[in-house]
């Protein structure tokens, strides 16, 4: 298993290098001047000359790329032109926000999507099946930003004074400033602890503040549901389609011929094999979540990876674009690796070798 993981990680290096090269080139092709974007009205010729010299923008393009690749191998992702801090510090601050949102959305998508698909597939051509298909098609068709605005209008405005009311913002309630767990525990501070402390739900559990946990959860529900809708619909459709295919196989018909109840046939015989393609879809859903996070974070006022990337692209903050894209790409590699490992447990015919 360890050799398999190491082999997959090594084979991913060319992919990551290609992504690094692509983001570097595309970033330089975007029209505009990074000095003008960063300094705006303060961008005099003298200041721009100092600015370009400080960040290496006056070097030849190949020298810039070589310097950046060397810095990456040393663990240095560069410094943000707009934020005036290291990209690593920005990641520690912004990535936990997106990670919490993406995990919550993925959990909702799987917990709701898989049972809906199983229910529809096990009752083929019934009203439940038709309703699931219509709902899934509708879920795929609605843009994330439209659904986000609808959710805000319904739950944050129309139902605000009812028990169903939810906050329109994804941030904690104003004035709620939780202490980092490492300060409460009296242990040393490091980058990993800062990263964990920036995950509101996890930090609230670690400091045993359930009032903060509930507040964070309430602010997370609407953006997570908005982000989860498209992958949830895709997972439901794939689960239904895969289950219908498996239910038509000989071994399932044999199980039915033995007099087994339909619930036993589905749960013990058909479901496991029907989940194989669903696992792949769940892994690929990460791309949908990252892409949708840009709009979701903007609408719900969350400062995560998506919003930071959008601001970096519009502000020509090369190092942030390259650093964040590289980290997200590495996340894709890890997710694909986990997907392959899960395959080996679900299907005995698939071997790690």
Features from the language model and the residues they span:
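Hydrophobic alpha-helical transmembrane segments of membrane transport/permease proteins
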Residues: 15-66, 155-212
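Alpha-helical transmembrane segments of integral membrane proteins
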Residues: 2-3, 95-128, 144, 177-353
């Amino acid at each position: 298993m360890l050799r398999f993981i190491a082999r997959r990680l090594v084979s991913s290096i060319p992919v990551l290098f290609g992504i690094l090269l692509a983001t570097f080139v595309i970033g330089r092709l975007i029209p505009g001047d990074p000095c003008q974007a960063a300094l705006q009205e303060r961008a005099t010729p003298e200041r721009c000359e100092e600015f370009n010299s400080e960040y290496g923008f006056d070097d030849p393009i190949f020298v810039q790329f070589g310097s950046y690749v060397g810095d990456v191998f040393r663990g240095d992702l560069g410094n943000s032109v707009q934020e005036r801090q290291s990209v690593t510090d920005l990641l520690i601050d912004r990535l936990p926000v997106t990670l919490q949102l993406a995990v919550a959305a993925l959990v909702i998508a799987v917990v709701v999507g898989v049972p809906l698909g199983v229910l529809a597939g096990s009752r083929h051509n019934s009203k439940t099946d038709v309703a699931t298909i219509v709902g899934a098609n509708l879920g795929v068709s609605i843009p994330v930003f439209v659904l986000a605005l609808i959710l805000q209008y319904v739950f944050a405005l129309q139902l605000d004074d009812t028990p169903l009311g939810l906050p329109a913002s994804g941030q904690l309630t104003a004035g709620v400033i939780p202490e980092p767990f490492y300060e409460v525990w009296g242990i040393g501070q490091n980058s990993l602890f800062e990263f964990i402390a920036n995950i509101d739900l996890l930090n609230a559990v670690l400091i045993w503040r359930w009032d903060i946990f509930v507040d964070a959860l309430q602010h997370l529900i609407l953006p997570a549901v908005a982000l989860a809708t498209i992958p949830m619909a895709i997972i439901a459709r794939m689960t239904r389609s895969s289950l219908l295919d498996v239910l038509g196989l000989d071994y399932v018909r044999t199980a039915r011929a033995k007099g087994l109840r339909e619930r036993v046939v589905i749960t013990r015989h058909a479901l496991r094999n029907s989940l194989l393609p669903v696992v792949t879809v769940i892994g690929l859903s990460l791309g949908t979540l990252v892409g949708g996070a840009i709009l979701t974070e903007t609408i719900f006022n969350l400062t995560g990876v998506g919003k930071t990337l959008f601001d970096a692209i519009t502000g020509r903050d090369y190092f942030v674009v390259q650093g964040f894209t590289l980290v997200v790409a590495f996340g894709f590699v890890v997710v694909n690796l986990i997907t392959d490992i899960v395959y080996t447990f679900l299907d005995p015919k698939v071997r790690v070798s």
